[in-house]
Amino acid sequence: MAVGVLALQGSFNEHIAALRKLGVKGVEIRKPEQLEQVGSLIIPGGESTTMAKLAEYHNLFPALREFVKLGKPVWGTCAGLIFLANKAVGQKTGGQELVGGLDCTVHRNFFGSQIQSFETQLSVPELAAKEGGPETFRGVFIRAPAILEVGPKVEVLADYPVPSGKLFDSISALEAPQENAGSEKKVIVAVKQGNLLGTAFHPELTADTRWHSYFLKMTSEVGEEASSSISVAGGEDTSSNEQLGNDLPIYQ
């Protein structure tokens, strides 16, 4: 089956373009009933509060939660990671509704505002083992969240060093006791738990499609028909968008 991409706001076009490079059709999802057409789903980066309001307006949250509960693969990038988290802190007054399912606590905008966005080379040994290529990945962080805590069943795929003071300021938002401060700590920026994948950065804004390939293999592991659908999808795209304009730059 095709891969759904939640197309309420954010970098959904870039995800669809990355899937197309791998010969897989991406389907824009805006309504609950459209989820029945796909076997997996990507929730892209964007403005998480805006995305949540639009999802609530279209009554998508019950269908998204059911999609997760059915064990279908879901990948959240940046704002999508916030959606999948069981708990989010650092939110605006009133917070936002979450899909949940990923046993972690995410700090929204952990790395700061738009002007504090950055790129860095992340160590990704698990990704390299599965997909080949270098053991680093160019992480593009734009008003990015970070994962502060994970449950025992969550596999950490990448982390990033931060000054201990910044981390402890964020942990205080969890009302958790602070440990003795060191010079540097790490926050988690990529995780996997069963059918769920989460990245705090934007793989869709790079020319490296290994995270998309990794997610497609997760999809193939879930259903017997998924692996064959990926191989026969080819480069054909019958969606209404013949050419996809990029809302955000693709970093080479």
For each feature predicted by the language model, list its residue ranges.
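Cofactor-binding loop segments of dinucleotide-utilizing enzymes, especially the Rossmann-like FAD-
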Residues: 8, 79, 201
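Amide-donor transfer/coupling interface in amidating biosynthetic enzymes
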Residues: 108-114, 120-252
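Cysteine-nucleophile active-site neighborhood
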Residues: 47-129
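N-terminal beta1-alpha1 cap of cysteine-dependent amidohydrolase-like domains
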Residues: 1-57, 61-72, 209-213, 217-252
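Structured loop/turn residues at beta-strand edges in well-structured enzyme cores
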Residues: 36, 97, 135
